[in-house]
Regions:
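Active-site helix of classical SDR
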Residues: 101, 136-139
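Residue(s) in the substrate-gating loop at a strand-loop-helix junction
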Residues: 120
Length: 258
């Protein structure tokens, strides 16, 4: 069985690759830097570059599992965040995953394989000053749901796996744009601090990777799944409670007063 993973040089992607290798999978990692997990094959690929994607997939004969994992965060308020930063986040977190998936689909149809989008609880909870990250995850989930129906006739399954806070290098790599923080009374910095503290104290990537692999191996792949019991509860409450109340709770959590 052959798995292709984007963004496996560290964090969740790296741990997922390790588990799959231990289970006898051949794992191909697509990223700009080599994956140091023993037993994996690395193909250097900037997944925001279509030529790189085409070259990478021309080197792959078969795919049973595609895991769209690469991504990064940009924090900042809607009003002052530079449009170039917003577009760059959509390029990697959304458009690149669509391009990679499109390139893999012919081979996935042949194998009746599976497509996984690594999503976030932020897709259903629009977090203040993280709005564009939330938007990229929500957009990818929408495509994932439609794709699931489109590919059903070919025996290809599609799932978005929502994650909560995870302790990885994602936190340090986040681009923080504090432009306008004086106008917003320091709310941007306070909100980002809350987010980073939650991540630093979040789930271990090894645990999350194990949950991801467990979900990918289910006989009947769900179209949506959540890793971690607490976040499953949060997502359930989001369905049951009025949207205005959910949004108010999120605001209280991520916009602490001075």
């Amino acid at each position: 069985m052959i798995a292709v993973i984007t963004g496996a040089s560290g964090g969740i992607g790296r741990e997922t690759a390790k588990i799959l290798v231990s289970k006898g999978w051949k794992v191909i990692c697509l990223q700009r830097h080599d994956c140091d997990v023993e037993g994996t094959q690395s193909i250097k690929c900037d997944i925001t570059n279509q030529q790189d994607i085409d070259r990478a997939f021309s080197m792959i004969d078969k795919i049973d599992l595609l895991i769209n994992n690469a991504g990064f965060g940009v924090s900042g308020c809607v009003e002052f965040t530079d449009m170039r930063e917003i577009r760059s986040q959509f390029e990697l977190n959304f458009f690149a995953h669509i391009a990679v998936t499109k390139a893999a689909l012919a081979k996935l149809r042949e194998s009746k394989g599976r497509v996984i989008f690594i999503s976030s609880a932020a897709s259903v909870f629009s977090i203040p000053f993280q709005s564009f990250y939330s938007a990229t995850k929500s957009a990818a989930e929408s495509v994932s749901l439609a794709l699931s129906n489109e590919l059903k006739q070919f025996g290809v399954s599609v799932c978005s796996i929502r994650l909560g806070d995870v302790k990885t290098g994602f936190t340090a790599a986040r681009k923080k744009d504090f432009a306008g923080d004086d106008v917003y009374g320091g709310a941007i910095a306070r909100s980002v601090s809350v987010m980073e503290n939650d991540e630093i104290n979040g789930m271990k990537p090894e645990y999350v990777a194990q949950k991801i692999v467990e979900i990918t191996q289910k006989k009947h792949l769900p179209v949506l799944a959540t890793a971690g019991g607490t976040y499953k509860l949060f997502c359930l409450l989001q369905k049951l409670l009025p949207a205005s109340l959910v949004n108010k709770i999120v605001g209280k959590m991520y916009m602490p007063e001075k």
